[in-house]
């Protein structure tokens, strides 16, 4: 009986050690033409350059779940959405991500300049909804979240890059 209990817990114990799955949340996050449901239209401002790709992710707006492992969130039935698109060579930089319902969500955009699918603070840019001031640690979810309405909600996220000893927008001195 004890071994059965151990086997039942195995998926929960291993979920925290499984590396991020790059395709999790993509199907749920992809916007479709003329779709009326709730979504964020994210304008990305302050790019260092037009290389690499954007990775836009949506998390529950709770301290415990914000920036948590995507496998753990999905296994627990919590909101996780992801959109990955190449950075356009020119023109506006807008991304669309669907959310399950109107409400508050943590939103983050990674400018993955070398396309390695992970955040390298020395190379890549990062931005959050609400555009909180960043140091070298993640912001509080209350400062890095936005409210999605019942339709498409527009937000602007300013990218931050390593400048001196902290992450900050390029336009700020």
Regions found by a protein language model. Give the residues of each.
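Bacterial N-terminal signal peptides
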Residues: 6-15
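A short, amphipathic beta-strand motif
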Residues: 40-46, 56
